[in-house]
């Protein structure tokens, strides 16, 4: 169901690692096929007049064959989600390539539906290609099969595309959460396993029950929303936070720094408040040591979790698209979310913090709500 062939034109094929990395962020790359002259002609013909590349982009150069992780049996909404995921991957790849060059139409073309993907493979000039790809699709399904009975899928629309998450019925632990990573995302699996092990003593880190070669099993937590004040208009899933939650996150970041670690993608979207276990940070894929960048950790007040990576280093990591991170390392520390500047969060609570926090959060809420209504009105007036 999730098989797709991306066609990369000459303009965007050097370096080829860039479009491949964009596609691999959300889909499993199965095969990369550099086209010979007859293959380029055949692929251009298969694309058809309405989907050929503009002259500035050049002729088809390379096929990148990719696949989404096969859906869980009985998932009636899988086809819609897979199509939306492939569209999102294509848009992410386009934006990635536009960073360094002027935009020229869409930078890739891609097939829609498995039949179209197989048709494209048939014209690539490699008689064994189709069989190799189908074998790898089957292997991908086997590797990414959740190893315990699934109660229901969780986080199906996550923009990360690196793992599947399910509520499962474990034979020993009962209801628990299994997160299984696809083969192309093993770096993220290793990061998360390392973080859950190194930070197991931290109250905000979910309890790791067990793990396998590419999966993690954690305690199931419910969410009563106690850490939330209100959702921010225009930022789906990002809520303003209560002061106790923000202080707990600032302390968590301080602990990370003391252990030579920093974290990106610390967002309100990744938080739950369990009535018994308290506040938890669900996603730890972007916990990393400073030594990865061969740098001496900065002073605690300048920790990257608070302040973000230096610009000269940010290009060395495929960062998630993070909202509300201008001037801060993570959105939980943005004034629109926390209500206080990071300097105030890192110091002891002071008189006047409460009214200032409330006023700042309300100000941001009103500004974003007004801006959203204005944007809608302007669109309707066109």
Annotate the PLM regions.
Residues 204-246:
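Conserved structural core of kinase catalytic domains
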Residues 257-268, 273:
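Catalytic-loop of the protein kinase fold
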Residues 274-378:
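C-lobe/activation-segment region of protein kinase-like
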């Amino acid at each position: 169901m999730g098989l797709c062939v991306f066609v990369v034109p000459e303009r965007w094929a050097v370096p080829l690692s860039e479009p491949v990395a964009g596609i691999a962020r959300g889909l499993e790359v199965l095969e990369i096929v550099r086209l010979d002259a007859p293959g380029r002609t055949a692929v251009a013909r298969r694309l058809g007049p309405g989907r050929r590349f503009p002259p500035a982009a050049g002729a088809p150069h390379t096929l990148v064959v990719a696949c989404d992780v096969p859906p869980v049996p009985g998932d009636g909404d899988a086809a819609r989600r897979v199509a939306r995921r492939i569209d999102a991957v294509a848009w992410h790849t386009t934006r990635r390539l536009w960073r360094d060059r002027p935009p020229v139409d869409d930078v890739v073309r891609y097939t829609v539906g498995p039949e179209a993907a197989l048709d494209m493979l048939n014209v690539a000039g490699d008689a064994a290609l189709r069989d190799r790809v189908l074998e790898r699709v089957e292997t991908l399904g086997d590797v990414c099969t959740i190893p315990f009975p699934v109660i229901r899928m969780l986080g199906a629309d996550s923009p990360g595309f690196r793992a599947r998450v399910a509520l499962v019925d474990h034979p020993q632990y009962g209801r628990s959460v299994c997160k299984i990573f696809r083969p192309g995302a093993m770096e993220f699996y290793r990061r998360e396993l390392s973080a859950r092990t190194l930070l197991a003593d931290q109250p905000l880190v979910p309890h790791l029950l067990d793990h396998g070669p590419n999966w993690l099993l954690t305690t199931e937590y419910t969410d009563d929303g106690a850490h939330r004040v209100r959702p921010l208009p225009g930022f789906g899933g990002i809520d303003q936070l209560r002061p106790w939650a923000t202080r707990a996150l600032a302390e968590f970041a301080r602990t990370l720094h003391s252990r030579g670690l920093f974290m990106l993608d610390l967002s309100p979207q990744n938080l739950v408040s369990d009535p018994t276990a308290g506040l938890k940070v669900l996603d730890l894929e972007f916990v990393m040591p400073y030594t990865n960048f061969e740098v001496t950790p900065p002073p605690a007040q300048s920790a990257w979790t608070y302040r973000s990576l230096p610009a000269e280093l940010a290009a060395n990591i495929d960062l998630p698209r993070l909202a509300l991170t201008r001037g801060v390392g993570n959105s939980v520390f943005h004034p629109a979310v926390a209500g206080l500047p990071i300097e105030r969060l890192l110091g002891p609570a002071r008189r006047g913090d409460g009214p200032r926090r409330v006023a700042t959060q309300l100000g941001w809420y009103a500004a974003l709500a007004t801006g959203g209504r204005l944007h809608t009105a302007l669109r309707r007036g066109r």
